[in-house]
Curated annotation (Swiss-Prot):
GO terms for biological process: cyclic nucleotide metabolic process. The gene is CPD1. This is 2',3'-cyclic-nucleotide 3'-phosphodiesterase. The keyword Hydrolase applies. Pfam families: CPDase (PF07823). It comes from Saccharomyces cerevisiae (strain ATCC 204508 / S288c). GO terms for molecular function: 2',3'-cyclic-nucleotide 3'-phosphodiesterase activity. Its EC number is 3.1.4.37.
Length: 239
């Protein structure tokens, strides 16, 4: 993961406090797990070697989100409509899962958002892919095939999670988000295209959750080397 770009809800907001409460709650259920800040990882493996690089990345984040939002507004404005991509929150949720991977032990899965995906593609092209001849195509392929935005609620090596713990996880998420969790069946013939092989349990929400955040929010460049407790925020910018 090395150097990653996060998008975080504003501190003190309903989204921040609700997600942080769930993270603390699951840490008590799995005591050896670390506590961390709620965030969506926009991209990781950033080429970032200095404070100047950090500042360039953050400046590019602001420029990218402003440009993409303006483009979406103008595109729909010509038709006399308000763009759904502009009106919809950058981060909202449609389900959750308990996975096999350490960093995806319990996650809230995000709805697709054109602006968030656009920012991820731009940042990937500018600061991850280094070959000038292939960076655009590789970033486009990555965002369409590998970018699955989510908010992690638990980091843990425990697998499988017991049925008793699964019931607690389900109940706490239902209570916090005011939704009912409906088990999602794996689509036949999907292979692992939907990530089914990487999860122990996956649920959809029965209704749309109001938990979300848009702008304002905070981009952070984070050094994710070593144990979670040693991760360091190298820079941040509010949008």
């Amino acid at each position: 993961m090395a150097i990653a770009l996060w998008y975080c809800p504003p501190q003190g907001s309903v989204a921040y406090e609700t997600l942080q409460m769930l993270i603390f709650s699951f840490q008590t259920l799995f005591p050896d797990s670390p506590v961390f800040e709620p965030h969506v990882t926009v991209t990781s493996h950033l080429v970032c070697n200095s404070k100047d690089d950090v500042n360039k990345i953050l400046t590019s984040c602001v420029a990218a989100i402003q440009s993409i939002r303006s483009h979406q507004t103008a595109k729909k404005g010509r038709k006399g409509q308000v763009s759904h991509a502009v009106a919809a929150p950058l981060v909202s949720f449609n389900g959750c899962s308990v996975g096999k991977q350490y960093f995806k032990k319990i996650v809230l899965e995000c709805n697709k958002n054109k602006i968030l995906y656009g920012v991820a593609q731009v940042m990937r092209e500018m600061y991850v892919e280094i070959d000038p001849e292939t960076r655009s195509s590789r970033a486009a392929t990555w965002v369409h095939e590998e970018f699955h935005p989510h908010v992690s609620l638990l980091y843990s090596d425990i697998h499988p999670v017991s049925q008793a713990s699964l019931r607690v996880v389900q109940q706490r998420i239902e209570d916090a988000l005011d939704v009912q969790l409906v088990p999602r069946e794996k689509r036949k013939g999907s292979g692992n295209a939907d990530g089914s092989n990487e999860v122990q349990m996956r649920w959809d929400f029965d209704v749309s959750s109001s938990l979300s955040w848009n702008i304002p929010g905070t981009f952070k460049v984070v050094n994710c080397v070593g144990p979670v407790q040693e991760w360091e925020v190298l820079g941040r910018v509010d949008v």
